[in-house]
């Protein structure tokens, strides 16, 4: 809801979308006014997807095809849309709103100047206490005022049910908004595609985004069945591809294989799920899938350029940036060069071995348990030997065994070695990792992707497209990494939940701007920390909800 204050006039505007209905409803309430006021509502029509603009006004591109009282229908660009107000007088006055400049445009290679068409406006005279509804749809609108009041009540009750269902106390309105926003990222229809969206406006189905966000979006909010369904869907997809996890599912349902860590994130999510619901016989297929995925990493995965070396570390034999999550390419240049042993991949790998060891024991497969335990011990030993930077008391981001020198740039990927349930490093090493991430990478809304002291550091998304792409992984801050940082910090400082809340507090303000109740995908790594990317990100929101559930919910 939004409150407009114009002198002594208070006008409240609320927007809600009824579940299962192809419409959006806008409610206007005149809370206070000394006299009657006139309100003119002029709809603007675009008929485009979010990544496009109308480059110039074209005569005849839109037509008013129906007009009856305060209900109109508009046709244009191959689409139809409908507008209805519950009261008022329609006045036809077509015009173009030209040269609308969008303040921020994060969609690559698209212009930010738009033109919108309007056929006229609805005029109303309203007094204090009056309510006016507007319905927007791509289907003819037949809803009566009784129907509108009914769906408004349903939406209100659904919100209350969401809060009651959550597995964490809604201690503030901000947390309530986060819980409610999580429902916009879940598709609970009977569909073979993953039930978790990457965010808005991207709306994609990606493995890593699903598994990172699953504990927060589903387990923390009381939707264990959605988590179970997501794990089973991706299990079937992975099984069909020789237990190699794809990066994403394309719109044509085709599997796309890119990054080396997706399968390891599945094991992470399966572990979180079983910790939450317990070891149950009916989930044996999920545990079995996690073990099969782990076993698949032991053999070479050629389409991911991935090998498991004799030292039990995973090695990426490629310069392809798509093999890891920092995958940006700007003007043909790889933004972050990484190859060989990648720190987050091997931290996840050690975690997967330990989880598989636990699952094997739960299923009474003692030989497999012993095998995973032996491999994990060797992996941890090699991890400490290869990645530990004794000079800076932190971890190298990546190590190419064929190179003569190591990249000493400080990046946030090392935080996973401290935050995951099973850590391949000692407590002293983990505390060093946490310290350097706090000193060099921590910002108000996330961990920077590069130490500001580096020459290549670019903390703001600004300038040419290639410069904006470089900034994503050369200095911008990511909230999902902050979730891992908070978990790591509280893991080794369990009595300092007060600082955990301090790390979370800045998001109270962010939740009131842009996407209400949502967390943006990434932020500038420098003041004023402007948000970018998806206005509602599954990974960002999911990680913060997970922290509330796992680390902070029992703190008084």
Residue ranges and their predicted role:
Residues 176, 245, 298, 302-309, ...:
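Catalytic cores of carbohydrate-active enzymes
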Residues 180-191, 232-240, 509-516:
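Glycine-rich, acidic and aromatic/proline-enriched surface loops and short helix-turn segments
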Residues 21-23, 29, 33-204, 280-281, ...:
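Acidic/polar, glycine-enriched structural segments that form the non-catalytic walls/loops
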Residues 319-337:
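A short, charged helix-loop
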Residues 1-19, 100-103, 110:
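Extended, loop-rich substrate-binding clefts of extracytoplasmic carbohydrate-active enzymes
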Residues 40, 147-163, 170, 174-178, ...:
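Extended, well-ordered alpha-helical scaffold segments
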Residues 32-33, 54-57, 126-128, 204-210, ...:
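Aromatic-rich carbohydrate-recognition surfaces in CAZymes
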Residues 117-123, 193-211, 250-263, 331-347, ...:
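Solvent-exposed loop and edge beta-strand segments that line ligand/cofactor-binding
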């Amino acid at each position: 809801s939004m409150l407009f204050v114009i002198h002594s006039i208070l006008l409240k505007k609320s927007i809600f979308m009824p579940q299962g209905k192809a419409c959006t409803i806008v409610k206007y309430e005149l809370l206070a006014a000394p006299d009657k006021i006139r309100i003119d509502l002029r709809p603007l029509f675009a008929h485009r997807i979010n990544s496009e603009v109308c480059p110039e006004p074209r005569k005849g591109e839109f037509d008013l095809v129906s007009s009856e009282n305060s209900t109109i229908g508009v046709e244009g660009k191959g689409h139809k849309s409908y507008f209805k107000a519950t009261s008022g007088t329609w006045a036809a006055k077509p015009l173009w709103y030209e040269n609308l400049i969008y303040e921020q445009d994060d969609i690559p290679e698209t212009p930010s100047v738009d033109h919108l068409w309007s056929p006229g406006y609805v005029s109303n005279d309203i007094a204090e206490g009056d309510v006016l509804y507007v319905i927007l749809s791509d289907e003819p609108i037949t809803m009566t005022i009784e129907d509108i009041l009914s769906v408004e009540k349903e939406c209100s009750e659904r919100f209350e049910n969401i809060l009651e269902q959550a597995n964490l106390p809604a201690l503030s309105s901000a947390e309530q908004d986060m819980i409610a926003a999580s429902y916009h990222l879940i598709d609970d229809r009977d569909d073979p595609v993953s039930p978790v969206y990457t965010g808005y406006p991207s709306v994609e189905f990606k493995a890593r985004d699903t598994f990172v966000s699953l504990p927060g979006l589903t387990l923390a909010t009381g939707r264990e069945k959605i988590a179970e369904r997501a794990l089973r869907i991706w299990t079937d997809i992975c099984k069909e591809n020789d237990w190699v996890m794809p990066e994403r599912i394309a719109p044509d349902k085709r599997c796309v294989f890119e990054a080396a860590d997706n399968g390891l994130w599945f094991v992470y999510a399966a572990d979180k799920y079983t910790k939450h619901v317990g070891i149950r016989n009916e989930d044996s297929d999920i545990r079995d899938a996690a073990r099969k995925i782990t076993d698949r990493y032991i053999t070479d995965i050629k389409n991911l350029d991935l090998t498991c070396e004799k030292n039990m570390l995973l090695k990426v034999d490629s310069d392809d940036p798509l093999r890891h999550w920092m995958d940006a390419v700007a003007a043909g240049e790889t933004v972050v060069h990484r190859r060989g042993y990648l720190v987050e991949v091997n931290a996840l790998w050690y975690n997967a071995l330990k989880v598989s060891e636990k699952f094997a024991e739960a299923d009474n497969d003692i030989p497999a348990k012993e095998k995973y335990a032996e491999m994990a011990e060797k992996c941890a030993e090699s991890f400490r030997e290869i990645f530990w930077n004794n000079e800076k008391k932190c971890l190298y981001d990546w190590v190419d065994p064929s190179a003569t020198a190591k990249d000493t740039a400080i990046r946030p990927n090392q935080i996973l070695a401290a935050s995951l349930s099973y850590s391949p490093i000692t407590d002293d090493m983990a505390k060093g990792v946490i310290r350097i991430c706090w000193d060099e990478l921590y910002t108000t809304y996330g961990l920077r992707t590069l130490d500001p002291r580096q020459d290549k550091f670019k903390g703001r998304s600004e300038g040419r497209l290639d410069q904006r792409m470089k900034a994503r992984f050369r200095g911008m801050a990511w909230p999902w990494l902050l979730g891992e940082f908070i978990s790591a910090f509280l893991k080794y400082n369990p009595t300092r939940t007060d600082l955990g809340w301090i790390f979370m507090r800045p998001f109270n303000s962010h939740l009131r701007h842009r996407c209400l109740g949502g967390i943006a995908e990434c932020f500038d790594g420098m003041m004023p920390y402007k948000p970018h990317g998806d206005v509602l990100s599954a990974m960002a929101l999911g990680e913060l909800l997970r922290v509330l559930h796992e680390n902070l919910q029992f703190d008084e």
